[in-house]
Amino acid sequence: MLTSCWGGRGMTEAEQSAFGTYVDQMDSTLTGVWFDRMGVSEDADSVLAYLCREVPRNGLDTAAFFLPQITRDLEIVHQLAFDSVGVSINELLPRLDAHLTKAYIRYATGQRYGFMRPRVFNRMDHKVGDPDIFVRVFDYDPAAPDTTEAAKKVRESDRLAYLVSSVPSTYIYQALLREMDQTRDAAKRRQLAVNMERCRWQIAHPEANKRQILVNIPAQQLWAINSDSVLDMRICCGAVPTKTPLLHSAISYLQVNPEWVIPYNIVKNEVAHHAGDSAFFVRNRYSIVDKETGDTLPVGHVSADDLLSGKLRVSQKAGVGNSLGRIVFRFPNNFSIYLHDTNNPGAFQRERRTLSHGCVRVQKPFELACFLLADADEWTLESIRLSMDLPPVTDRGRNWLRQHEEAPRPFKLISYQDVKPDVPLYILYYTAFPNPQTGAIEYWPDLYGFDKVITQEMKWISGESSNR
């Protein structure tokens, strides 16, 4: 009787573990979590009312939490109407107890850890040329759902308070929830529900009113945030086959007029077939260097096989025409990506700017440098400006330029500058997101198809699947 209430359908592995001994205990004692021989506990109604309000408010399906059945069963108990519905008290109470316990643990655990596992994003794309290897794009390792605490709290006196405390407290989630309260548009509600799920994962989330840089891929936008101001700019991000990974790091230093050491996969796919073509290498200002000796090799003496041997380095000279532009912003990460200037500023005028091999190109590189170096002295910023071939704005800078007009470009007044303290960086993926300047929720297209993945993974909890 009780076993059929639980069933196996729709139960996650964590839920199965939490309820491993539940049936045996109930069958032997006839004393449940929500009732004993004196009747149903007083807070069963409070917990049910909370779930009936908050589950649909989060865009979730009430049936996935057994709420219609729980509501009917609890009403029968209150009215002592067992005979009129043809069900015995010995059948209904265990069913009510089992469903309400499962709803409690499912909601509390889902809100604390998420209703789906985001690691699925790292099994979307295969490495080019090797279908057995997946490309990692989600650079987090969130904690797996743990029902232990919820299974304990459901038996304690403060169980409603614990349920309430399970809700994510991030400002992004709260903003999305307010928007959900205000909109009746079905498509927007589905989009909001997907983005609310992102807020539940046990990963680093941006904090309100903190000095930080946010890059939101669907918005194709960067915001550099201080407590009292926001610098915004367009970005170009990774193309669909070479997605920009989602990560949390901190910008630690910037490099002015960088040489671009071309990654091996780009050499393989875009450079190697030009081996021996001196015009191509001259036009792109590429050079070939022996990694062991440091010698620059003649283009005509290097074959495609040589370029792919791993013994040579192909790099692009610093200055005008360099693909990284005039400045790069470095931060620790597992993908060798960075934020950088570009030699193609016209790309920022495009509506869709998924163009790169994974790095993020920024529209206002000097302004971003000024944000990062907020405490730098005037000459440091002027040195960066001159090294980027930007017009000087100080008398000292103008005098320096007059004295060095004949010097070779690019100027190298400054090559590296530490960012102290490091500035947190979040590369995010939200298709509904509160604009850091206005607070208004803005909706963006699902450029990488990640929303579709979440929607598919959450069918069991969103009402789009009957298998629970």
Residue ranges and their predicted role:
Residues 1-3:
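Sec-dependent bacterial lipoprotein signal peptides
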Residues 5-128:
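Cationic-aromatic interfacial patches
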Residues 6-29, 105, 122-125, 151-468:
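Well-ordered beta-sheet/strand-loop patches within structured domains
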Residues 59, 85, 89, 110, ...:
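Short loop/turn hinge sites at secondary-structure boundaries
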Residues 85-92, 132, 146, 184-185, ...:
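Alpha-helix capping and helix-coil boundary motifs
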Residues 113, 129-131, 142-144, 155-158:
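Extended, domain-scale alpha-helical bundle/helix-rich regions
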Residues 126-138:
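Eukaryote-specific, cytoplasm-facing alpha-helical/coiled-coil scaffolding segments in long proteins
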Residues 144-146, 173:
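A sensor for short, sequence-defined functional sites
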